């Protein structure tokens, strides 16, 4: 497939309109429209639905966009190699993850990686898991970390780890010596929970409903940092989180993690995702391997590599 029609197609798909693509490409709108029509005629497929508010991809168009995005990234990598800048000394690694991984774990891993590769730089987008998957699928980031309850389509899973939910509390808490807990054990204590919409809150609410209990949290917040600090400075407050989320902080802050045994709270997985079919540049591949090893040290043994 010729490069020019593919470039025009990619621009229209990303901008959603012929005029925006023409502006991006510095050509006339008619030139963009002609290239798209010729491409559809060549393939014998409709790639876009023409709508009043713009161009919407069809199912064949979605498939071609995935190919075109990989092609654009590969061309950039080749050009960088030809210019001699795609080295271990110069490269930005783009990441996306939910706050649960951005609060402590991923910043620590990136800092430790730079001890070995001081020329590495990072751009980290903190978004929800669904958005992180979409960003890596679109090629906007190199690597995504996500919490998942179901299989994720359209991306390559480089690593999948169990990510069960645990109860976080002060080491002096009455429940701190227990080997495991259930949601029923938490009813008598103040809770600090994430707001509805997070995977933790979703699974916690399901477990409570199945047990027929109504738990009203003392604190709710969309900020993991706020929830963690509340537990740290309280005597009896309990929060729920994953092991990887706070693995490097509990010891220094005299907090403990007690596993939750409710089956509903053990369904979550932590995934490392990359774009399907894409060959990452060398430094990104090194970081991916480093990240996987770090995750394996804090996750459950049942981890699978892609």
Where do the model's predicted regions map?
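Short helix-boundary/capping micro-motifs
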Residues: 10-28
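A short LG(V/I)-centered, amphipathic sequence patch enriched
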Residues: 40-57, 62
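Alpha-helical linker/hinge and terminal dimerization helices associated
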Residues: 42-43, 64-86
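Flexible hinge/capping segments at coil-to-helix
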Residues: 87, 155-165, 169-191
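Central regulatory/effector-binding core of bacterial HTH transcription factors
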Residues: 90-152, 221
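A late-sequence structural motif
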Residues: 105, 256-301
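Beta-alpha-beta core module
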Residues: 153-159, 163, 225-276
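Secondary-structure junction motif
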Residues: 190-211, 242, 280-289, 298-301
């Amino acid at each position: 497939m010729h490069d020019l029609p593919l470039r025009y197609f990619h621009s229209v798909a990303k901008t959603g309109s012929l005029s925006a693509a023409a502006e991006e490409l510095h050509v006339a709108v008619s030139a963009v429209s002609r290239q798209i029509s010729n491409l559809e005629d060549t393939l014998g497929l409709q790639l876009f639905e023409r709508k009043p508010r713009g161009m919407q991809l069809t199912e064949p168009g979605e498939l071609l966009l995935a190919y075109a995005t990989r092609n654009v990234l590969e061309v950039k990598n080749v050009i960088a190699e030809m210019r001699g800048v795609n080295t271990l000394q110069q490269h930005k690694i783009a990441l996306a993850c939910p706050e649960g991984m951005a609060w402590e774990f991923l910043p620590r891993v990136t800092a430790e990686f730079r001890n070995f590769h001081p020329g590495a730089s990072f751009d980290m987008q903190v978004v929800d898991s669904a958005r992180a998957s979409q960003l890596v699928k679109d090629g906007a980031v190199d690597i995504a970390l996500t919490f998942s309850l179901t299989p994720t389509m359209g991306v390559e899973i480089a690593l999948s780890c169990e990510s069960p939910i645990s109860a976080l509390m002060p080491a002096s808490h009455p429940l701190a010596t227990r080997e495991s807990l259930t949601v029923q054990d938490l009813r008598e204590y103040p809770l600090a929970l994430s707001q509805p919409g997070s995977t933790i809150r979703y699974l916690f609410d399901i477990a409570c409903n199945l047990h027929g209990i109504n738990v009203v949290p003392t604190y709710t917040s969309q900020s993991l940092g706020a929830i963690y600090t509340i537990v740290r400075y309280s005597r009896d407050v309990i929060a729920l989180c994953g092991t990887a989320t706070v693995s490097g902080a509990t010891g220094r802050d005299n907090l403990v993690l007690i596993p939750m045994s409710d089956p509903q709270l053990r369904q979550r997985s932590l995934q490392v995702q990359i774009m399907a079919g894409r060959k990452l540049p060398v430094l990104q591949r090194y970081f991916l391997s480093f990240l996987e090893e770090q995750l394996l040290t804090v996750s459950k043994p049942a981890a699978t590599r892609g």
